[in-house]
Amino acid sequence: MEYSEMLIHRIKDLCRQRGGITVLRLAKMSSLRQSTLDNIIRGNTKDPRVSTLHRIALGFNMTLTEFLDFPELNDYVFEEEEEIINPAELKKHKKTERPASNAVLP
C-alpha cells in the first residue's frame, strides 16, 4: 500500500470512528477548502503538505504526531527519491570541481 493510500484510509477511518464525519464537515473543522480534502481522499494529491496534514489532525482534535501514529504508516518503508551515485562517479565529480575561492563575501 502506498503512502497516499494509507493517509486516505487513516482519514476515512477517523471519520467513521467519529460518527461519520463528512468531507465537507472535516474541511470546515480543519479550516481547509473542501476541494483540497477531496483531492487527498480521491488520491489526486499524492503527497500533501505537512501544513495540510497538521490542519486535518487539528480538525480531528489530534496532534500531527497522533494523526500519523498508526500501524500501517509505522511499518511503511519510504523509498529514496534521490538518485544514488556510484562512488566512482562521485570521484569524477570531485576532480572536476573548482577550488573554493578565498574571497571574502561582503
Give residue ranges: language-model regions.
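DNA major-groove recognition helix of helix-turn-helix/homeodomain DNA-binding modules
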Residues: S51-E66
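A short, Lys/Arg-rich alpha-helix, primarily the initiator
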Residues: M1-R25
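Short, charged recognition helix plus adjacent turn
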Residues: N39, D69-P106
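Short alpha-helical elements of helix-turn-helix
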Residues: E5, H9, Q34, R49-L53
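Recognition helix of helix-turn-helix/homeodomain-like DNA-binding domains
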Residues: S31-P48
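Conserved hydrophobic/aromatic packing and binding residues within compact polymer-binding modules
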Residues: I11, L26, L37-I40, F67
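Residue-level detection of the helix-turn-helix DNA-binding "recognition helix"
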Residues: R16, R42, E72
